[in-house]
A protein has these predicted regions:
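Active-site beta3 strand of CheY-like receiver
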Residues: 50-56
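Receiver (REC) domain active-site loop signature in two-component systems and cognate sites
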Residues: 61
C-alpha cells in the first residue's frame, strides 16, 4: 500500500461494539482507526486538530442519528470536506437516496463484505488525496 494511504485516518461511528469491531478488523493495518459510539462524539472527533480523512457512519443510533450527524458535519467549514460513507442496515432506495441528499459519498448496506468496504474506502481516500493536491 502506498505510504500516503497508510497514514490516513478513518473514523468509524456506530453504537454497536460488534459493528465497530468488524469494520475495524476489515481496515486495521491499512489505516489509523478511531471510533465513536454516538453522533455527538463523532462530531467532536471530526472537528478535532487531527480530523479523520473519511468517516464510516451508521444511521440508526440513539439520540442523534447518522443523517443528523452528516448534516451537522456538512454544515461546518472545518468538516464539510470529509467524505462520509453510510454503513447501515437500512436498505430501502429511499434511505439510500436520503443519505446521498445529506452529503454522503457512498452507501453500504449491512451485513458488510469486508473486501467491498476495503475497496470503497480506498477509492474515496484516493479521491480525497487527489482533491487535496489540486
Amino acid at each position: 500500500m502506498p505510504e500516503e494511504l497508510a497514514s490516513r485516518r478513518i473514523l468509524i461511528v456506530d453504537d454497536i461494539s460488534q459493528n465497530i469491531k468488524v469494520l475495524g478488523e476489515a481496515l486495521r493495518g491499512e489505516y489509523t482507526i478511531s471510533f465513536a459510539k454516538d453522533g455527538r462524539r463523532a462530531i467532536e472527533l471530526a472537528g478535532s486538530e487531527t480530523p479523520p480523512d473519511l468517516i464510516l457512519l451508521d444511521i440508526m443510533m440513539p439520540e442523534m442519528d447518522g443523517y443528523e450527524v452528516c448534516r451537522e458535519l456538512k454544515r461546518h467549514p472545518n468538516t464539510c470536506e470529509i467524505p462520509i460513507i453510510f454503513i447501515t442496515a437500512k436498505s430501502d432506495v429511499e434511505d439510500e437516496t436520503k443519505g446521498f441528499g445529506f452529503g454522503a459519498v457512498d452507501y453500504i448496506t449491512k451485513p458488510i463484505n469486508p473486501t467491498i468496504v476495503q475497496a470503497r474506502v480506498r477509492t474515496h481516500i484516493e479521491l480525497k488525496l487527489h482533491r487535496d493536491n489540486l
